[in-house]
Curated annotation (Swiss-Prot):
Positions annotated to bind substrate: 148, 180, 217-220
Organism: Yersinia pestis
Known function: Catalyzes the formation of N(7)-methylguanine at position 46 (m7G46) in tRNA.
Pathway: tRNA modification; N(7)-methylguanine-tRNA biosynthesis
PANTHER family in UniProt: 3-DEOXY-D-MANNO-OCTULOSONIC-ACID TRANSFERASE/TRNA GUANINE-N 7 - -METHYLTRANSFERASE (PTHR23417), PENTACOTRIPEPTIDE-REPEAT REGION OF PRORP DOMAIN-CONTAINING PROTEIN (PTHR23417:SF14)
UniProt name for this protein: tRNA (guanine-N(7)-)-methyltransferase
């Protein structure tokens, strides 16, 4: 395991700084199918990281609403959404290679042309590659809740991240989060409510019912049978 939670950054004088990441990069073993997908389909759907803005319309070869998903896991839901919404362009980011391979394989089998995949830290992608006010939706489904209190600072949903997402959304664009850990849902709501320029789309100013746009996962169905909850939050950029 490579600990990527803390990564070095440098100030203007070249002094090393510590940056807390929201994930630990686990180099899981690739199956033969996942490796084949990476070798065969990455050149078609994969996007290499670059520290400069990218033209998203050129990336997809067309102009269409753009949905960015952060941390797509094995890609099952992402591929389903891209299949069900051919009128939209989807950009998925995942740091774990087996998930990237699995997603590429599923996307190829589905014959998708509206999906692009990245294997990199999503914060760096947002900071450096995504143009300002270019995204119609950002999706963050079931991020690591970092249950222990001493690890809460590693949660990706923090004020600087939420501000960063807002800057990349178009006015009217939506930041959609979902979690099955109630303390994290409460944390998300507190952070989002403290940032100006967002409108909570919940009528009760808290959580929204799962929209049809977010597929119901097998894990979620199993949790429902056991009485476990899932909390969706949707906030629109209003300015």
């Amino acid at each position: 395991m490579i600990n990527d939670v803390i990564s070095p950054e440098f100030d203007e004088n070249g002094r090393a700084l510590r940056r807390i990441r929201s994930f630990v990069r686990r180099q899981g073993r690739l199956t033969k199918g996942q490796q084949l997908a990476l070798d065969s389909y990455w050149p078609v759907m994969g996007v290499e990281y670059q520290a400069a803005p990218v033209d998203l319309n050129t990336l997809f070869g067309r102009e269409a609403p753009i949905v960015l998903e952060i941390g797509f896991g094995m890609g099952t839901s992402l591929v389903t959404m891209a299949t069900n919404n051919p009128q939209q362009n989807f950009l998925g980011i995942e740091v774990h290679s087996p998930g990237v391979g699995a997603c590429l394989s599923s996307a190829h089998d589905a014959g998708l042309s509206n999906l692009r995949i990245m294997c990199h830290d999503a914060v760096e992608v947002l900071e450096n590659m995504i143009p300002e006010a270019s995204l119609d939706m950002v999706q963050l489904f079931f991020p690591d809740p970092w249950h222990k209190a001493r690890h809460n600072k590693r949660r990706i949903v923090q004020t600087p991240f939420v501000e960063l997402v807002k800057s990349k959304l178009k006015v009217g664009g939506v930041f959609h989060m979902a979690t099955d850990w109630q303390p994290y849902a409460e944390h998300m709501l507190e952070v989002m409510s403290g940032v100006s320029g967002y409108l909570n789309l919940s009528e009760q100013n808290d959580y929204v019912p799962r929209p049809d746009s977010r597929p119901l996962t097998k894990f979620e169905l199993r949790g429902q049978r056991l009485g476990h909850g899932v909390w969706d939050l949707m906030f629109e950029r209003k300015e």
